[in-house]
Amino acid sequence: MYICSTDKHKPAYIPAFERWSLYKSIWMNHWEEFRKIYDRRFLSKYGELSEAKIEEVEKLLGCGNFQNGFQRYSCEECDVNLIVPFSCKSRLCLSCYRKKLFGWSVNLSHILNLDLRHIHITFTIPGTVSNILFQRRCEVEDMITVAAEVYKKELIKFARLKFKKEEITISDKDWLPGSIATLHKCGNSLNFNPHIHLVGTRAIIHKETKEVLHLSFLRYKKFAFSWMKTFCKHYEKEKVISNAESLVIQNKYKNGFHVYFQPIASEEKEPLFRTSEYIASGFFHNSQIQKVDDGKKEITFRYKSWVEKDTREKSFQDQTIDVYEFMARMLFFLPDPNRKMIRYYGIYANRIMVRHASLEAAAHQPDNSILSQRTWAQAIENSFDAKPENCPDCAKRMQLTVVYSYSARKTIEGLKETHTYLKGYFRPKVRSP
């Protein structure tokens, strides 16, 4: 299973020699000035511009530049060449993040139990609480584990009630649901609004016997109150809020924090994977940018402002902000290096460990030494209905060689002498008779 567009009318595949986008142009045109003014304008608001974040920007600026090295696909029959520049793997690069997301989605079917029903839950916190976390530079990533614990606890509680007459002993050590959860630190308009997206099984499974207890109904109101109580208890323990502040918050929100539930259709698998894509996707996309005014130093982007509850119809708004403010927010919301933002709990924690072990073993096999290239090829095939590793003229599979930075420029200059760059490919020049 993989993530791709549901649009059946796929565009033609035209390879790009070097990667460019409006988003990347913002960083290319304004990065140096942004670094100069950052401390004065944003240090007190967004914190230090760390070396790790600077490194992510520098990787983004070099993304798709053939001089940093590339993969070369050559057709032995037609002498057609395709150049695929190395990706930067920066967490700030929206293009590379989409590639990473596709690679993740390819393995989803090995992780999720497709025989079980699932539900998508969004755990939110009030604006007043968000402001406290923002002002105190709190580690909001802890919310992921807190939400997953609430989900497990409430399912176990309800299962004990439902199966009480059947005299089944249900302990939270022996019975587990499965869930995938992540943190979105901001709202759609790039405002600080930390919330958790979780996809969980509507069942609990015994760790040893693998017996399944299905839970068709969940006590939604209990979740809201349990989420608030567990959240406050955790951040009180972490000394982010005092006991007095915790009591004030709980008295103010007597019904708990809002928790939104969206059942995932059980008769089809695609909605489950689309929902999983949503929770794993980044907080911003290239397609949102409507306009960049370098003169005024402004960016206009479109964001989803509302979703009609019954029809699921989406409403959108445009927002124009200072380009430096945009850059500061993108860096502020960037996850810390090596921090796992998609986390697996319960039965899925075990399945992901098994999957990682198999991938690690495959990576050391001679026939699977180019797993990342195959991920790229699969992504192109599913997005454009084209096989990028095949020659566009004779359709035969092209030969792959890797060209590193020290010889990249010389290789390209040699190609330009004998070939013409046309529609994404280097084709042999027509010789005079």
Task: Tell me the role of every PLM-derived stretch.
Residues M1-P433:
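Beta->alpha loop/short-helix hinge microenvironment recognizer with preference
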